[in-house]
Amino acid sequence: MQPNDITFFQRFQNDILAGRKTITIRDVSESHFKAGDVLRVGRFEDDGYFCTIEVTGTSTVTLDTLNEKHAQQENMSLDELKRVIAEIYPNQTQFYVIDFKCLR
């Protein structure tokens, strides 16, 4: 079985599959992805494969520069997005935005 290239919390699976979540915000450990990369996607909880995505772009962002567009691309409110990022990456301020499209 092929390993997954990137994982998402299971709660985001349906939004990714439906095209409602089109970015992911990660820390430096996952800053190596680039436009054109095709990635196997698994669930964080069990590493079960659920789709393939293509990276369409990358950029950097800080917690303070997250905006409504980022929130919309994550399919959540801006306050919720900032809270989720702060929970996942406590004490970090520099992040990497990975834009993607689901290929199935």
Curated annotation (Swiss-Prot):
InterPro entries for this protein: AC4CH, ASCH_domain, PUA-like_sf
Pfam families for the chain: ASCH
Keywords from the named record: Hydrolase
EC code(s) of this entry: 3.5.1.135
Enzyme class: hydrolase
A GO molecular function held by the record: hydrolase activity, acting on carbon-nitrogen (but not peptide) bonds, in linear amidines
Active-site residues per Swiss-Prot or TrEMBL entry: 21 (proton acceptor), 24 (nucleophile), 74 (proton donor)
Tagged with keyword Membrane: no
Function: Catalyzes the hydrolysis of N(4)-acetylcytidine (ac4C).
Family: Belongs to the N(4)-acetylcytidine amidohydrolase family.
Name used for this protein in its record: N(4)-acetylcytidine amidohydrolase
Annotated source species: Salmonella newport (strain SL254)
Gene (name only): yqfB
